Amino acid sequence: MFSEVGLFLVNIVFSLLGTILLLRAWVYALRVHPFNPYSQAMFKVTDWLVVPLRRLVKAGRFWDWTSLLASWLSAVAYLILSAVILTGSFDALSNLPMLLLAAVFTVLRWTLSLVFWIVLLQALLSWIQPQSPSMPLLRSVTAPLLDPIRRVLPDLGGLDLSPLVLLLLTQVLNMVVTRVAFSLVPI
């Protein structure tokens, strides 16, 4: 029972941290205004990890490589802690190549979950409270993902099914990535 609770807590903490780091990289790529209150909160939560890493890896023109590296390192730590909680030990040397690859798939899983929740939040807010102060940020973050789907889907006269299509797509991809990630590392 304690291992289940420990695994649950490790999953929550590292998934949230990794997802916030991915969102930080995404917001950087979209050039969202850094003084946005949501961006400021994200920076405050993640600066303890990103700022020291920035001495080693600089942010690029388009991608914040430091935040992506920090998210990947969070995934590595998550997988190691999960293995230790479940088995009581972890042989890092024999499992290192698979661990590093599984961390990539874990980051992909977190990315797909982030897309799912942001699109769902934007869709719900557009129905419930379209004038919400967070809607401009949500629109700017989801537009690059939804616009290609909108171009393919037929116009239904005010009914936008692109969020539904993207939600289904992310769930299917998340199932595939999760299966691959957990088959790589014997946890």
Kindly give the residue locations of the regions a language model identified:
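Selective transmembrane helix interface/packing segments
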Residues: 1-187
